[in-house]
Amino acid sequence: MQITDVRVRKIAAEGKMKAIVSVTFDNEFVVHDIKVIEGQNGLFIAMPSRKTPDGEYKDIAHPINTETREKIQKSIIEEYERAKMEEESSEKVQE
């Protein structure tokens, strides 16, 4: 399964959640609402989740193995960094 598109849909300057991302696989399947989070050890992703009645969060969709998670995370963080740099450079042009 190949990652064929990563779209950074929202970038936040405040708080720990830095972006919301959609990832397309094989031009056939998309997963929305993957979050880019800033943690103590740098950026990581949080897969889309829902809150259970007892207050616990459960992933709706997630990679089954570490290799796939790392591949998805690497692609998302690279695209987030690129989008963030583009946004910052366009803000400088407007000033």
Curated annotation (Swiss-Prot):
Top-level taxonomic group: Bacteria
InterPro entries linked to this entry: SpoVG, SpoVG_sf
GO BP: any one term: sporulation resulting in formation of a cellular spore
Transmembrane segments: none
A Pfam entry, by short name: SpoVG
Swiss-Prot/TrEMBL keywords: Cell cycle, Cell division, Septation
Function according to Swiss-Prot or TrEMBL: Could be involved in septation.
PANTHER family: SEPTATION PROTEIN SPOVG-RELATED
NCBIfam families: PRK13259.1
Annotated family: Belongs to the SpoVG family.
Name under which the protein is recorded: Putative septation protein SpoVG
